[in-house]
Amino acid sequence: MLIRIYRNLKRNITEDGLIISSSPFLVKSMVSKIDFSKPLRILEIGSGRGAFTRELIQRMSADSQLDICEIKTEYNPWIEQLIAANPDKQISLHNCCVTQLLTEAERYDVILSSLPLKNFEDPGSQHEFLYRVIRAMRHGLKEGGTYLQYQYFKSNQSDIETVFGKKMDDVSFVPLNILPAFVYSMSKQAS
């Protein structure tokens, strides 16, 4: 029994980058950085069971659009239920890798990511996939747009700064989450 629990826990951390769903404190910390007073095109990456999705749907205007990118189809029932419960909102679910979705330049005002970036590190390839993912997010973000990312360890900040070509706008710490998390906020400047 303990071995099964350990294996499930290890799989969750390795594949999904989480132990349990994000706490309301982490959700509020990230979502509060978004200005919902105007119509937005939002991309949520790595929705899981929808902790952030629920809050984004609640706060976004009817004129806003939410695209959800979740590679793992096992989470579809939770997300589809949220979409069905909000027929007045413009929401689309995409089951693909973020690098496949973000081919159009400057499409999004906000990109909110729950991707476990630390899991994409591969020293043998100089972190090629990690950089491809971060570059795709920068490519898909409009000039002046906001990229939000949380990490359980203060990692990958320099990778994000390298791709965006500037220092992080803000880094905050949310202790009331399992695991405690760092929230990164980065705006895109003109190239």
Predicted segment positions?
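A short glycine-rich, Lys/Arg-flanked "PGG" loop and its adjoining helix->strand segment in the class I
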Residues: H127-E143
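Class I SAM-dependent methyltransferase Rossmann-like catalytic core
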Residues: L2-S37
